[in-house]
Amino acid sequence: MLSVETHAAAPWPDALDWAARAAEAVAAAFAITPFAALADAAPLVEVAVRLTDDAEVHTLNRDFRGRDKPTNVLSFPQVQNDLLESLANSDDGEILLGDIVLARETCAREADEKGVSLAAHATHLIVHGALHLVGYDHMDDVSAAAMEALEVKALASLGIANPYADQD
């Protein structure tokens, strides 16, 4: 069973149910991967989503990635890629798959630049982060294209337009 725990540490707009949005985004991301069974697996599979500010993400990005600046989203997988396939068959009671952390100011700025709502952009970033938790990456053009295609498919299932449509 999939559990998404969301914690808002910074002033994210209250008009949206961020916990429900995060849960939908993570579930949509997993549903279009070979790891869809994790959502209904016997062990509790938990993903933590933290909505925070640029200052906290800057610190995390510096400390864990060696990049001394904020970024829009960070993912911290807790399960090695080679163990992911066996999780659905695990008899462990609970598995922490990992953490996704979003920076409000960066997300809001990027949403404005793209002409989309903060909710749509944050949902995209949560989908992106969830895909990282199950082993997807964008270190080269081929893996980036594959990951973007999955993001587009997951977002479409949530009624969100292709965020890459205007890119050449």
From Swiss-Prot:
Cofactor binding remark: Binds 1 zinc ion.
Top-tier EC class: hydrolase
Record's keyword annotation contains Cytoplasm: yes
Main location, first listed in the record: cytoplasm
One cellular component (GO) term of this entry: cytoplasm
Cofactor requirements of the protein: Zn(2+)
Source organism, top-level taxon: Bacteria
Intracellular or extracellular location(s): Cytoplasm
Binding site for Zn(2+): H128, H132, H138
Family annotation (InterPro entries): MetalPrtase_cat_dom_sf_prd (IPR023091), YbeY (IPR002036), YbeY_CS (IPR020549)
BP terms from Gene Ontology: rRNA processing
Family: Belongs to the endoribonuclease YbeY family.
Function as written in the Swiss-Prot or TrEMBL entry: Single strand-specific metallo-endoribonuclease involved in late-stage 70S ribosome quality control and in maturation of the 3' terminus of the 16S rRNA.
Protein name (record): Endoribonuclease YbeY
Organism (species): Sphingopyxis alaskensis (strain DSM 13593 / LMG 18877 / RB2256) (Sphingomonas alaskensis)
Gene: ybeY
